[in-house]
Amino acid sequence: MSTPRKEQTQKRHRRLRRHLEGTPERPRLAVYRSNEHIYAQVIDDAAQHTLAAASSLDKDLRTSLNNGANCDASTAVGQLVAKRAIAKGIQQVVFDRGGNLYHGRVKALAEAAREAGLQF
């Protein structure tokens, strides 16, 4: 019997998190992708504190987005989370794709964050 896609994603994320850790100097940019929206957080794992966050549900983006589950929304979220992180003095991050494949919406978010000035 095959394993459902969500379980596969969770399994990949557990494997990935063994090697990734956000520090105060270089926090973790975590991405969560649902069927309807996309979410991104910049997290300091040492202090267990979220430093910056953005999603396709943000008031800043909601009016300009027709759909929260496409590459355009991911690009907008990537730019917004990068802008918020840079405003707090964060230049470098560790990218945590959340067990999702680096393709499509996750890739669009990562590339937009890089273009906006985050280094990873």
From Swiss-Prot:
Keyword Metal-binding included in the entry's annotation: no
Name of this chain's protein: Large ribosomal subunit protein uL18
Function text: This is one of the proteins that bind and probably mediate the attachment of the 5S RNA into the large ribosomal subunit, where it forms part of the central protuberance.
Lineage per the UniProt record: Bacteria, Bacillati, Cyanobacteriota, Cyanophyceae, Synechococcales
PANTHER family in the record: 39S RIBOSOMAL PROTEIN L18, MITOCHONDRIAL (PTHR12899), LARGE RIBOSOMAL SUBUNIT PROTEIN UL18M (PTHR12899:SF3)
Region span, Disordered: 1-25
Residue pairs linked by disulfide bridges in the UniProt entry: none
GO molecular function, one term: 5S rRNA binding
Listed GO CC annotations: cytosolic large ribosomal subunit
Family: Belongs to the universal ribosomal protein uL18 family.
Keyword rRNA-binding recorded: yes
